[in-house]
Amino acid sequence: MVERINGKTILTTPISAEDLKGIKIGDIVYLNGSMTTCRDVAHRRLVEEGRELPVDVRNNAIFHAGPIIRPLENDKFEMVSVGPTTSMRMEKFEYEFVKETGVRVIIGKGGMKENTERACKEFGAIHCVFPAGNAVGDAREVEEIVRAEWRDLGMPETLWNCRVKEFGPLIVSIDAEGNNWFEQQKVEFNKKKDAATEEICKQVGFIK
C-alpha cells in the first residue's frame, strides 16, 4: 500500500507492483512494515546454492545492511545500530534474487546497475538509497526484530526480519520502469564537466 501522509510518501507492506507505478527516481519515501536485512552471503546462498530464503520477502523489503544487535531474554533481540552497506556488491545477484523472491523494495548504500534495473522493470521493484551516518538513530525506527534466520552466518549476515515504522528517508535510485537516477546524474555531470573543461582550457591556454 502507498499513502501520502503529512507530506510524506509512505509504503506499507505488503507492497504491490501497482503501488510503485507512481514512484519515480529522486522521490523520497518511507517504509512501514516488514524489512529484512540481507547482504552478500544470503544472496550467494539463494542464487549460487539454490537455497530458499527462510524469510518470505515477497511484496516486502530487504535492506543491504549489517546491523549491531543486542540479545535479550527468551530469544528476543534489540536493534542497536543499523546502517546501509554498499549495494553494488549485490549487483551480480540482484536480478535472480528479485526474480526468485518477489521482493519489492531494495534498500542500500550507493547505486546499482543493469541487473537491478532489469529486475525492477520486469518484476516491479525499486531500489532506494538510505543515507548513511546515523545508524544509531535509524535503529529507533525498528519497532521489533520479529525473527532471526541463518544465524550461522554471524551477526552482520544473519537475516534479521524487522517491523519498521516510517523507516527512511529512502531516496529512489531505480524505479519500477528501470530508470536509474545515478546513471542519469552521471550523464548530466559529464555534460557540465566537458563544458567546464573547455572553458578552463581557454583561460589557461597560455600555459602550453
Where are the regions that the model predicts?
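Short, structured beta-strand/loop micro-motifs enriched in basic residues and often containing a Trp
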Residues: 5-15
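Short, well-ordered loop/turn sites that connect or cap secondary structure elements
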Residues: 23-24
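Feature captures the catalytic cores and cofactor-binding loops of soluble hydro-lyases/lyases
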Residues: 37-169
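C-terminal binding/interaction regions
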Residues: 140-208
